[in-house]
């Protein structure tokens, strides 16, 4: 699958030229994952991020959306695709995996932190999805007691919660199941 990316970052245009450019989805993800979560994160956290990022990208690629390389869509830094072997490994080991609900690719959101509470999408935006459930997030709460992180929109995967859970030995598929209720 291919995805069209409007390049706005100087480091990306220096390598790939002016956008939008057409990129192989899996190669694109190799530049997204280390831009969104620390390369030094536990491998299960990197895998969870890879699946969430792939799901987000596939949903938009299927709709013909041209994404950009900022956090308005997903952060993408082309130079990191080659200098982040652990993120690349996570992308390769989860190749093709996307989250679905009722047989459809979900509209997959994630953020740095949810402040200790997973939010319904309807609490933040105009549309409610059944796989975003309002509930306490013990992983995000535990992570934030170790390091202060400002919460963002709080819908979907919390990156600090994901990293904390992975360090405790939680597999990536269980991390994803917690943040995307009922999605497979």
Which stretches of residues belong to each language-model region?
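Conserved, single-site charged/polar hotspot
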Residues: 1-184
